[in-house]
Amino acid sequence: MGSEAIGALGLGLLLVLMILRVPVALTMLIVGVVGFAQIISWDAAVAQLKTVPVEVLSNYSFSAVPMFILMGVLAAHSGMAGKLFDSTRIICGGWKGGLAIAAVGSCGIFSAISGSSLATASTMTRVALPEMERYGYNRGLATGALAAGGTLGIMIPPSIALLIYAILTQQSVGDMFMAGLIPGLLGLVMYSLTITVVMYLRPSLAVAGEPTAWKEKLLSLTGLVPFLGVFLVMILGIYFGAFTPTEGASVGAFATLIYALVKGMRGAQLWHSVQETLALSAVVFFMLVGAETLGYFISVSRISFSITDMLYGMDLTPIVVVLCILALYFVLGMFMDSIAMLVITVPVVYPIIQAMGIDPVWFGILTVLTVELGLMTPPVGMNVFVIKAMAPHVGLGEIFKGVAPFVVSDLLRLTLLILFPVLSTFFLL
């Protein structure tokens, strides 16, 4: 049997194991080791199994992962999220639908230091949903805004998804973060406009909150200082070369730790944050070990090159290839976790993108945005299920219905990024 056929069988086995709910990291590890052994030898596969974990764990760039996770966990447990929503509520709450806009804005700002969509969605739901329910907001609108706002964490830097894509494709982490800045902020603006349009079409879904004076609005900006301070120090430091993205992650984590200690985080809370960080980091690293092992198998099977040759034979233009891959990501996103989808598929599709001369940074932004859509779409929609767990009294169908306008908004944003690549590459020019 040829190596390409073994590669195709391996990908089929990968799909079967995932359908059987075998953990994604273990699935990639099994397929990678067995496939590599079939093409090369069992001795080589065992030797690889010994070296790959060391390669991953000793990779300097990967050390940014636990730092970004720690930063988000500390922000979630230190009370920063509550103060953040209080500030945005005072600024926007007097508008019709203003609390939903405040929730989306809070999600965008919180995600700037959490790096995780699920952490952003769960934290801000705990803080913002009770307030929106108190004012009689339609539950679909309220939870839909939070589910959509949570997805901003996967794009606005620092983003764990962008970091993993950069490492898997050997791109500059700093370039990926800079490329995600405008698309992330564009998402924040478009979500706010979506709420405004929904309120215009269906004004009964929400009411205006209590109006506040301009002096109070200006004073409330102090609640944004910790977030903007940490975010700007990291992003500007990375952009101007003061430190690497990995060092920037450590700077951000240290600054967040200082804030948490000043605000009274002590002993048990701090230890719980460290434990949560270690648990989440272990999951990510196990997946990366599996992805690296799978990547070696895909490389020796040469299946990516076979797919590339087939595409060349079909005489498809690069943009058509990109659209086909994004359509595949959109479908996969309905069933798979976002990080799992990246680590499984990027080793397969990246050689194709590279061979066709497509900008890998631009493609990475499109990929992550399409993955972001999967966090909101049924049947899986991880953000939706996180919010359902936080608000069991709200029906799942109600949340998915509330998310629908934001899915349309994201499709429009994806279209803009495809038509105008400069939106992704502006800070790289």
For each of these PLM feature ranges, what is it?
Residues 1-429:
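Alpha-helical transmembrane segments of multi-pass membrane transport proteins
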